[in-house]
Design a protein with these regions (language model features):
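Sec-dependent N-terminal signal peptides
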Residues: 4-14
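A short tyrosine-centered beta-strand micro-motif
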Residues: 77-79
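Asparagine-centered strand-capping/turn motif at beta-strand->loop junctions
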Residues: 26-34, 42
Length: 114
């Protein structure tokens, strides 16, 4: 009986991990503006990746919209965000976990310029 319970518990843990890996990682835009460029780089670097907004059918991410993120593993990242007004800001040290949703709020934005 004890072995059966351990086996069931192990299967549940494995299934939960597999389902998280099957879900897309997504960015939730909680800034005040529509985002037209969203790039990620490993925290503390300027090795910016592709514009993730290309993953959206209209190429932008409205307030309270979620964007599918591709080509990014779990870890800490900096984000470069350009909104429709032309403002470019950064969000630093974002914790991203594969298969989960992460958000950036207006208060997270620093070093903004036009």
């Amino acid at each position: 009986m004890h072995r059966t319970l351990l086996l069931v518990a192990a299967l549940l843990v494995t299934a939960a991990g597999a389902s998280a890996a099957d879900r897309p990682t997504r960015f939730w835009n909680l800034t005040h503006n529509t985002v037209q460029e969203f790039q990620l780089a490993p925290a503390g670097t300027a090795a910016w990746g592709e514009n993730q907004c290309k993953n959206d059918k209209d190429g932008t991410v409205d307030f309270d919209e979620r964007l599918r993120i591709t080509g990014v593993e779990s870890g800490r990242y900096d984000a470069r965000i350009k909104d429709m007004s032309g403002r470019v800001c950064f969000a630093r040290n974002i914790n991203i976990r594969a298969g989960e949703v992460f958000s950036v709020e207006e208060r997270d934005l620093v070093d903004c310029s036009r």
